[in-house]
Amino acid sequence: MTEVVAAFDRACSRFRQDSELTGLNDAAGRAPLRVSPLLLDAVMAALRAARLTGGDVDPTIGQALIALGYDRDFGSVGSVGSAVADPVRVAAIAGWRTVRVDPEASTVRLAWGVKLDLGATAKALAADRAVALAFQHAGCGVLVSLGGDFATSGAPPPGGWSIRVTDDHRSGFEEPGQWITVRSGGLATSSTTVRRWHAGERTVHHLIDPRTGAPARGAWRTVSVAAGSCLDANIASTAAIVRGERAEAWLQSLALPSRLVAVDGSVRHLAGWPSQGDDLTSCAAIGAGTGMTVATAGVESAGGPTGISAAAAGVQPMGAGLA
């Protein structure tokens, strides 16, 4: 797994001067650049995310993040309490349709001034790749977690994989959250509460609305989604933050179990995401012994145009959770 993560870092990091993505961004406006199969896959995954979300998840936001001061690893940028000297600047987004990819030639061409940021998809894609490789070698059920994004492969342990969902995956057990179990597929959380810093007099975060070039200012501070893969879960959770109030109907239409935390801290559960408290009682009364199964393995969303797969085998409550 460490080899997979290291390979993605070398190919897809925006913060490494020696990364392949940095070389691609530096070549913007020039001739198409031949890239490795890994970076080609990562760029195509990012463009797929843009297409499936109508541009709400757009990899051409790199320049907007740089304008906000997110031009180096977040550990160096700092968090709320750390300041970027310049006032908030908003950069125009060129748009994902300006990226030209030739899969047969393995080339990518960026328009002049475009800088790709693959943060919304590359980590989740790495989790899916890592868990597939681990399953191939281990021959048993595997769960991989990369920075709060989860991918599974193979048969789960009895009762499923226990995962604690919170605003911040680094938080301790004293923080509000919920225990759930996942039997297959992927789970991802997108949040405006973790990567935050001061730019001028404003507090900003890394989830950019491509329509404005500024941090998304929607109804939700955190969204968790279960889907058929970690990549699809992260695409949906990121898009939901950007879409704001429009996200509820969209997630429902895709039958993607979701947990949405509003800016005031109130929580919404959609499309079969288990509620707190009484779900186990209901399941015991039914006698099914399998909890709140919400989707069938491999089922695509109704109508199919989105291409985002529904949760592979269900999300279930793990006790009453935490308040």
Where are these regions (language model features)?
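Mature catalytic core of soluble alpha/beta enzymes
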Residues: 2-323
